[in-house]
Amino acid sequence: MSSQNLERQRIYQVWPAKNKFYCGGRLVFGPDASSLLLTTCMIGGPAIAFSIRMAYLISHRHPFFHSLTLIGAILLTFMAFTFLFLTSSRDPGIIPRNKQVSEAEIPDVTTQSTEWVTSKLGSVKLPRTKDVMVNGFTVKVKFCDTCQLYRPPRAFHCSICNNCVQRFDHHCPWVGQCIALRNYPFFVCFLSCSTLLCIYVFVFSWVSMLKVHGEFYVVLADDLILGVLGLYCFVSVWFVGGLTVFHFYLICTNQTTCENFRYHYDKKENPYRKGILENFKELFFAKIPPPLINFRDWSPEEEDDVEVGSIASELVRAFGPKDTKMSSGKSDSEARER
């Protein structure tokens, strides 16, 4: 390695947002990544207690039944933690910031806007919003003062991470990360596995106790651990399961949490809806796009040399030239402010 590279820093070391980076910038976490410890304990604690109890019962009663139950619990727990890690440790779709506003982003003066902002250059005034065509619908995109760009459709600036993020759904404190374009499928799988694990532990805790002959209260007192685990999972499944059902509804209608609360697409025409099967195919079977930023790259030597990202190119990369078209001025379609 040259002495010049030794003096330079990588992008993750100078990134101005609040993310936490590990393994030399290979793992990207949110600023509240420490909350993962609580989530891990809430899932792992009951799962480990249940597994230990099943292992104990293998040598005491119904060994075949409890052996299969133990294997199922271990598999579900492993899957839940795998998807949790994949959700929390990857770039969710962070959009590169502009050091300056490129000419491609300066809209025509005919663009209608009631509010104008001054870029960091101080010499260029930009409208606060401009129109973008998405699948025949006009969508308003906002200018982000922090990132110095017009956000792509469905993008949002997360105040917790201080990044503009592609197809932003929400910032989840339980995983300590934004849920967005590049980790949403893993998040849904994590919720699904957690829900199944809750149901699994609840059902087999009670089935295991019911296999013991005698008064229910006597059996419960004799195996209090399984009783407590069953009650814990019964309460938990209403929260985790409800969230899982809600996100499957969002997938069916091709909405994000942010859009559902802000724009109520269930009462309006949704420009992104493609039908239930196509919506699921787009989420779970389409290739996850590569990150727009390689945080392990060397940071530019001269701050003025590099414009880290241009919204015109990002729109094409994120949505494809057939789906998105820049437009100046108003359209007759209903404009949705983004």
Curated annotation (Swiss-Prot):
Active site: 172 (s-palmitoyl cysteine intermediate)
Catalytic activity: L-cysteinyl-[protein] + hexadecanoyl-CoA = S-hexadecanoyl-L-cysteinyl-[protein] + CoA
Family matches, as Pfam families: DHHC
Transmembrane segments: 32-52, 68-88, 186-206, 225-245
Domain DHHC, residue spans: 142-192
UniProt topology in membrane: Multi-pass membrane protein
Matching InterPro entries: Palmitoyltrfase_DHHC (IPR001594), PFA4/ZDH16/20/ERF2-like (IPR039859)
Localization in the cell: Endosome membrane
Region ranges (Disordered): 319-338
Composition bias type Basic and acidic residues, residue spans: 320-338
Keywords: Acyltransferase, Endosome, Lipoprotein, Membrane, Palmitate, Transferase, Transmembrane, Transmembrane helix
The EC number(s) this enzyme carries: 2.3.1.225
Top-level EC class: transferase
GO cellular component: endosome membrane
GO MF terms, alphabetically ordered: protein-cysteine S-palmitoyltransferase activity
Task of the protein: Palmitoyl acyltransferase.
Swiss-Prot/TrEMBL domain comment: The DHHC domain is required for palmitoyltransferase activity.
Family: Belongs to the DHHC palmitoyltransferase family.
Record's protein name: Probable protein S-acyltransferase 1
